[in-house]
């Protein structure tokens, strides 16, 4: 039996919260005389289920975040060439979410029309892509 296929199936089980040990899976495969094609089919099915579950989680995070979903603001569709200053590289580095993981605050300060809201939305969108809870609200809505 191919260890990498077994490891992939086990990773899917873990992601899908299916409680089965590697030994139990191996025993099940051997007891039921699974062929290599059978194991491939099982692997593809659980990989598909894991991907579908992951996508559903991301969509739920996006819905709960209150970010606009029709035309999402992302780092990919932000024009960094329009930003000037000495900390532009830090702004481009926000996509890695390293500030979040290092427990640092991010303040976006500047005049109107410079892309602060776009960057905030892109940051929230990226958090949702990593299944992190996000809630987007504009400053003007805080006053209400």
Name what the model sees in each region:
Residues 14-70:
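Interdomain "pre-motor" coupling segment immediately N-terminal to P-loop NTPase/helicase cores
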Residues 124-137:
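Post-Walker A helix-loop "phosphate-sensing" segment adjacent to the P-loop in P-loop NTPases
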Residues 89-101, 109, 123:
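P-loop NTPase catalytic core of nucleic-acid-dependent motor ATPases
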Residues 103-119:
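Walker A/P-loop nucleotide-binding motif
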Residues 101-103, 130:
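Short loop/turn elements that form and flank the Walker-type P-loop nucleotide-binding site
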